[in-house]
Amino acid sequence: MSLVVPDNFQHILRLLNTNVDGKVKVMFAMTQIKGVGRRYANIVCKKADIDMSKRAGELTTEELERIVTIIQNPSQFKIPSWFLNRQKDINDGKSFQLLANNVDSKLREDLERLKKIQTHRGLRHALDLRVRGQHTKTTGRRGKTVGVSKKK
């Protein structure tokens, strides 16, 4: 960032219903959007032909629109399906990129489905226990029973 701030510099921009810091470089600014990581932000910048050394506040409205269309429609811009965060969806079998509030809602739907069909993972989630095979004999004892009190 140069010492003199240009006139059209935006300190906070609105991208996909998220406030993004304009002082950060473009790639890292996009990671503030839920569902967009550094790798996905990198490939979006390359597909949109945007200089990586630019700050997010220096982007023109046309460049911002390009970024938004690429993020929302990755398959049209030849981003491979293995790069997306939702592959082979259980309902329609398609792959797509979940963004912002959709990430939370899809996760909640998945957990509800697991609980409904009573899989092992779903039951562990329902009982608030560890799901991924961790040992639970000594750790994770929050809030269950109180320890033994010593006599005086």
UniProtKB/Swiss-Prot annotation:
Gene assigned in the entry: rps1802
One function term, GO molecular function aspect: structural constituent of ribosome
Localisation per UniProt entry: Cytoplasm; Nucleus
Family: Belongs to the universal ribosomal protein uS13 family.
BP GO annotations: cytoplasmic translation; ribosome biogenesis
Species this chain originates from: Schizosaccharomyces pombe (strain 972 / ATCC 24843) (Fission yeast)
Name of the protein in question: Small ribosomal subunit protein uS13B
Main subcellular location of this protein, as a coarse class: cytoplasm
Quaternary structure annotation from Swiss-Prot or TrEMBL: Component of the small ribosomal subunit (SSU). Mature yeast ribosomes consist of a small (40S) and a large (60S) subunit. The 40S small subunit contains 1 molecule of ribosomal RNA (18S rRNA) and at least 33 different proteins. The large 60S subunit contains 3 rRNA molecules (25S, 5.8S and 5S rRNA) and at least 46 different proteins.
RNA-binding found in the keyword field: yes
A matching Pfam family: Ribosomal_S13
Role this protein plays: Component of the ribosome, a large ribonucleoprotein complex responsible for the synthesis of proteins in the cell. The small ribosomal subunit (SSU) binds messenger RNAs (mRNAs) and translates the encoded message by selecting cognate aminoacyl-transfer RNA (tRNA) molecules. The large subunit (LSU) contains the ribosomal catalytic site termed the peptidyl transferase center (PTC), which catalyzes the formation of peptide bonds, thereby polymerizing the amino acids delivered by tRNAs into a polypeptide chain.
